[in-house]
Amino acid sequence: DRPCHSYTGRMFARIQSDIQCILERDPAARSRWDVVFSYPGFHAVVLHRMAHSCWSSGWTWLARWISHWGRFLTGIEIHPGAKIGERVFIDHGMGVVIGETAEVGDGCTIYHGVTLGGTSLYKGAKRHPTLGKGVVVGAGAKVLGGFEVGDGAKIGSNAVVIKPVPA
């Protein structure tokens, strides 16, 4: 077993899973090729996974560079330190911002214009929200602060959330 081969296998399995989740959740998705070539939310998540891997390995400059290009190409800004679960779907993602200490659980759906932002400037502190599994965040919502949004919660479009949300 070569470590790189193992990592590459896991990476492609996650990509397959991400594609499948989009096909299941978006009636406009016609095929795998459609998702791979024309879904900026998918591109942003794949680029984030690369950036996060670099960030976690101490290659912060490379992580920031990948993140910067991801934002330029997709209009979606995900800090390389953010943790993104599996089968996360960013739909119509233009303007999405996900901060450094944010965590997005498995199976979440995030629509355009969403901010998972911080409310403090303290380095090393948990400044951004944690979304549980299966959370849906509607277009334009702002979720601000280092608190938890429970599994399966639904946050309405244009909501401003500054306190924990129960499951």
Show which residues each predicted segment covers.
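Terminal amphipathic alpha-helical/low-complexity segments used for targeting or macromolecular assembly
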Residues: 1-74
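Left-handed beta-helix
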Residues: 74, 79-80, 85-86, 91-100, ...
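Glycine-rich phosphate/ribose-binding loops and adjacent secondary-structure elements
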Residues: 123
